[in-house]
Amino acid sequence: MEPYGKGDGRVRWVTPEWLMENMEDVAIIDCQPNIHDYILEHIPGAVYLNEGLFREPRGKAPAMYIPEGAVELIFQQAGIENRPTVVYTGTGGVKGWGDGLEQTMVAYSLARFGHENILVLNGGLAEWKRAGGELTKVFPEVEESGFSAVTKEDFYIEYPEFKRIKDDEDVLLLDARPAEVYEGQGPWIKPGHIPGAVNLPWADLMDPENRTLLKPEDEILELVNSVGATPDRKIICSCGTGREATNEFLLFRWYLGYPDVRIYEGSFTEWTQIEDNPTVTGPDPR
């Protein structure tokens, strides 16, 4: 199966079988949750890149994206070029920390800063193993690249605009956190969710046995339609810190091909740090 997705092609998905046949034509990024997982086993040729490299504290928000110049340096030092680049994660075999979001975080970070040919390995390392893919403990030699980062400002929405438009009739604000957190059981200074946010837990879109593997498209469409996420609406993806939302941003923008999708990167964490902002508890958006 060829790389698939309905967006502009910046992000697509691939199967293990496709990767096996195209190993010589792609770069590969391993973003397993801990370096020890990569040391234990990785796909041959994969360079390790941790998702935590891309965010830092800013103002009262503890996890915002680092400046363009810093990202450019990371990409260059990791040898990343604007060529077909496969991203995958595993289950955290050594430390047990993995939740599957590592690969959507890194894929989004690549896209956000100008990479134009990102291939997400659907099912991650687990599917690679299931398909009989080769594993190694040998590290590739990394050569510095000349990557030029360009921030894609149309991928995200910042707080002032978010607050101004979030209740517009043509806007649908999604909250990708688990239902119990959305309803009020999270660790934030205020409980619940942003008023008007509709809960679409990111994990509901994934295979229950492998959270890096998308459910069949018909099941995904049934879920997104059930919350009113139709292509004619402006979709804003949010969660706790902007991490879970990357899964839904990639899915809506490049898997389903929706025309107007952005992430509120500050998400519930930034929202709750502003004293006057209200929150809602329980299962209803308002």
UniProtKB/Swiss-Prot annotation:
Entry-linked InterPro entries: Rhodanese-like_dom, Rhodanese-like_dom_sf, Thiosulfate_sulfurtransferase, Thiosulphate_STrfase_CS
Domain Rhodanese, chain residue ranges per copy: 22-137, 167-280
SMART domains reported in the protein's UniProt record: RHOD
Single GO term (MF): thiosulfate-cyanide sulfurtransferase activity
Keywords: Repeat, Transferase
EC number(s) reported in the record: 2.8.1.1
Active site per database record: 239
Reaction(s) catalysed (UniProt annotation): thiosulfate + hydrogen cyanide = thiocyanate + sulfite + 2 H(+)
Pfam family, one: Rhodanese
PANTHER family (alphabetical): THIOSULFATE SULFURTRANSFERASE (PTHR43855:SF1)
Entry's free-text remark on domains: Contains two rhodanese domains with different primary structures but with near identical secondary structure conformations suggesting a common evolutionary origin. Only the C-terminal rhodanese domain contains the catalytic cysteine residue.
The protein's name: Putative thiosulfate sulfurtransferase
Lineage of the organism: Archaea, Methanobacteriati, Methanobacteriota, Methanomada group, Methanobacteria
